[in-house]
Amino acid sequence: MTEEATTTLSSADIIEIMKLLPHRYPFLMVDKIIEIDGDNAAIGIKNVTVNEPHFTGHFPESPIMPGVLLIEGMAQTAGAICAKKEGQPGNLVYFMTIENARFRKPVVPGDRVEFHVKKHKQRGNIWKFHCDAKVEGALVAEADIGAMIVRKDQA
């Protein structure tokens, strides 16, 4: 098996995602990763349900998923790529920067959000990604994000 094969992910269900990321309900924003191109790109999935706690107050009569949670889903999808590539238990992926964030359409209960994440560049433990969130192929949000890999004992 090649080094590339041992440090990249082909797809991931929720169990694998929870091994890669420290997030848990209600803040785990990725249910599944369906497509991965090594450490270059991935598509994460979030199935949006009315039972999620943020819908209690955002907004009770017309529930809309907060945009910041769409950004978090993008960051978690990118974080799974970073965590798997680094391949060392005990590392954390910290969300560092957000640029060019745009929210195009509301996301509501019943939607299936796809987080399309593409690596823009990597230098050492710093990663940069361009991310799009889509529902039924339509762009609902986009952003450029930065992440840093940090050893858990140094966090």
From Swiss-Prot:
Gene3D superfamilies: Hotdog Thioesterase. The keyword Ligase does not apply. GO terms for molecular function: (3R)-hydroxyacyl-[acyl-carrier-protein] dehydratase activity. Keywords: Cytoplasm, Lipid A biosynthesis, Lipid biosynthesis, Lipid metabolism, Lyase. The active site is at residue 58. It is an enzyme of class 4 (lyase). Involved in unsaturated fatty acids biosynthesis. Catalyzes the dehydration of short chain beta-hydroxyacyl-ACPs and long chain saturated and unsaturated beta-hydroxyacyl-ACPs. This is 3-hydroxyacyl-[acyl-carrier-protein] dehydratase FabZ. It comes from Rhizobium etli (strain CIAT 652). The lineage of its organism: Bacteria, Pseudomonadati, Pseudomonadota, Alphaproteobacteria, Hyphomicrobiales.
